[in-house]
Amino acid sequence: MQARAYCPYSKYRVGAALEAEDGSIYLGCNVENASYGLTICAERAAVFAAVSAGARKFRRIVIATDSEPPGPPCGGCRQVLAEFGSELEVESVGPSQSKRWRIRDLLPDAFGKELLA
């Protein structure tokens, strides 16, 4: 999936595979835009594909990148992932290393529906 990334500006290719509770896998890649604010990250692309297909509960997301060491998702992606549960497992894989977290550890004070009045 990483190879499908559209990143003519940053050249930073990212792919993501999101596993739903039922074992289904949803894929995403980053898609950049000349208007940088319209760029979508691979993690969010995978979440949006899953939600569009009807999935709402997820086990884990695996992110593929060329970075060493591989980094965690950006803040925006952390917030979107946290929307679907604090126990979500996040794994970031680079060419020779990988790292794992729980989304609750990456975003301990996530904004959630319980804060909406």
Predicted regions: what they are:
Residues 13-20:
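Short beta-strand scaffold segments in enzyme catalytic cores
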Residues 7-10:
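Short loop/turn motifs at secondary-structure junctions and domain boundaries
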Residues 43-47, 74:
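A general structural signal for well-ordered alpha-helical segments in protein cores
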Residues 29-44:
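Compact, glycine-rich, soluble single-domain proteins
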